[in-house]
């Protein structure tokens, strides 16, 4: 048995301590984990510095931001755990009840998933978010961090386990796979005897590898090739605010806009204003400018590189924005259907017909009208922290909170009935 299999077996053996814990016990564990995380801040920051030093010069600046921890972010992680503790416990919720003509009483009840596996990349905060959500939803959790964030993840898990050890929940219910090589991931993908669910969080390559190779049931958290379409009937000042926020507030995350579609009737007015805000004003403020990848029509109005064949199919996760002009809302929808990833897409318009057409025809987990796509987030949706953004339709779609991490079973109460 490999080390990874041993860790999977430990999690499976410990799951009963979580599955059978009541709400008070789970909340007590989460609060202890949050306190322990803050108490271990110095150790976590030291480990994070090791990760940052190892990654220096190897990853883009925007990705470094995802990897970076500081005291404020550790406090935010701890507060995120406390926020999960404050959420209603979904386990045990009665979803449906019915009584059959023969007198059988059927109850559909929400139950824990069992053991959840998470494979993720360079975001240390996923470690605490995933642990909190899994444990509150009644499941043990097995984490596999990317190499870039491994030292940070190890220090975070050590702190969380210290907190768990003060409660009745077995600390073995939280595991961090030590094998950061490819084989560690593939062992998790094949661990059908140990894992009830596997969730990948990361770039397109990771997600594709998990979806194509896993025998464990998977919820796909797709990449975010996020579009915003600025319609001819848009309020341009509103559009400017939305586009700036969607692209520059945090470009390294999956709900950040990657493609801007602009109606050709307003391109000559709108695009130069946007260029001034996203390029010249940012340079003057000492901030990274947005670099445009332009189709030929957009290039008539602003400066930038000519868009390549793949630019409208790329999740940049950087200060790069692909820009295309379109002749109608129908053309915008057609482009998104051809190039989108069903994550988050939005329209800016004051035309109700255009908005209704867009929301009806765009098949994404979150569709926005006159708002930034950056709101696709468990916390913003009132779910607490999230396990990821599901872009599939089965079991879960959009931000995955506690309910999305549970299953259900039927309890059938009889008085001696037999089937004829």
UniProtKB/Swiss-Prot annotation:
GO CC field: cytoplasm
- Can you state which reaction this protein catalyses? L-glutamate 5-semialdehyde + phosphate + NADP(+) = L-glutamyl 5-phosphate + NADPH + H(+)
Q: Which Gene3D superfamilies match?
A: Aldehyde Dehydrogenase, Chain A, domain 1 (3.40.605.10), Aldehyde Dehydrogenase, Chain A, domain 2 (3.40.309.10)
Q: In which pathway does it act?
A: Amino-acid biosynthesis; L-proline biosynthesis; L-glutamate 5-semialdehyde from L-glutamate: step 2/2
So which domain of life are we looking at? Bacteria
Q: Output the Gene Ontology terms for molecular function.
A: glutamate-5-semialdehyde dehydrogenase activity; NADP binding
- State the compartments where it is located: Cytoplasm
SUPFAM superfamilies according to UniProt: ALDH-like
Q: Which PROSITE patterns match?
A: PROA (PS01223)
Keywords assigned: Amino-acid biosynthesis, Cytoplasm, NADP, Oxidoreductase, Proline biosynthesis
Where is this protein primarily located? cytoplasm
E.C. code: 1.2.1.41
Extract one GO BP annotation from the record. L-proline biosynthetic process
Q: What does this protein do?
A: Catalyzes the NADPH-dependent reduction of L-glutamate 5-phosphate into L-glutamate 5-semialdehyde and phosphate. The product spontaneously undergoes cyclization to form 1-pyrroline-5-carboxylate.
Q: What family does this chain come from, according to its entry?
A: Belongs to the gamma-glutamyl phosphate reductase family.
Name the UniProt record assigns to this protein:
Gamma-glutamyl phosphate reductase
Species name: Neisseria meningitidis serogroup C / serotype 2a (strain ATCC 700532 / DSM 15464 / FAM18)
Q: Gene encoding this polypeptide?
A: proA
């Amino acid at each position: 048995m490999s080390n990874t299999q041993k860790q999977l077996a430990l999690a499976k053996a410990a799951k009963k301590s979580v599955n059978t814990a009541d709400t008070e016990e789970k909340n007590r564990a989460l609060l202890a984990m949050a306190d322990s995380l803050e108490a271990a801040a110095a150790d976590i920051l030291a480990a994070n510095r090791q990760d940052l030093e190892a990654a220096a010069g190897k990853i883009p600046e925007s990705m470094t931001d995802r990897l970076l921890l500081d005291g404020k972010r550790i406090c935010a992680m701890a507060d995120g755990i406390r926020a999960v503790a404050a959420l209603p416990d979904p386990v045990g919720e009665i979803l449906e009840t019915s009584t059959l003509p023969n007198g059988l009483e059927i109850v559909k009840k929400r139950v824990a998933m069992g053991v959840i596996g998470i494979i993720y990349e360079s975001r240390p905060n996923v470690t605490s978010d995933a642990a909190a959500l899994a444990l509150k939803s009644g499941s043990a959790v097995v984490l596999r961090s990317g190499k870039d964030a491994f030292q940070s993840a190890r220090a975070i898990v050590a702190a969380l386990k210290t907190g768990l050890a003060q409660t009745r929940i077995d600390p073995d219910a939280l595991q961090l796979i030590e094998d950061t090589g490819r084989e560690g991931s593939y062992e998790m993908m094949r661990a059908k005897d140990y894992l009830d669910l596997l969730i990948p969080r990361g770039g397109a390559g990771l997600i594709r590898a998990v979806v194509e190779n896993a025998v464990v049931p998977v919820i796909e958290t797709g990449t975010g090739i996020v579009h915003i379409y600025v319609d001819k009937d848009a309020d341009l000042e509103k559009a400017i605010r939305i586009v700036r926020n969607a692209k520059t507030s945090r470009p390294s995350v999956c709900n950040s806009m990657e493609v801007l579609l602009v109606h050709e009737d307003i391109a000559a007015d709108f695009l130069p204003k946007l260029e001034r805000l996203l390029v010249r004003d940012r340079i003057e403020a000492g901030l990274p400018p947005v670099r445009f990848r332009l189709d030929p029509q957009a290039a008539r109005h602003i400066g930038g590189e000519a868009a390549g064949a793949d630019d409208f199919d790329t999740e940049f996760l950087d200060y790069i924005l692909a820009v295309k002009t379109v002749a109608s809302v129908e053309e915008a929808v057609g482009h998104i259907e051809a190039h989108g990833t069903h994550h988050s897409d939005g329209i800016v318009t004051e035309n109700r017909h255009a908005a209704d057409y867009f929301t009806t025809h765009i098949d994404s987990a979150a569709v926005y009208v006159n708002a930034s796509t950056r709101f696709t987030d468990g916390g913003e949706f009132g779910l607490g922290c999230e396990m990821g953004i599901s872009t599939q339709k089965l079991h879960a779609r959009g931000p995955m909170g506690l309910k999305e991490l549970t299953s259900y079973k039927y309890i059938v109460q009889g008085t001696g009935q037999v089937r004829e």
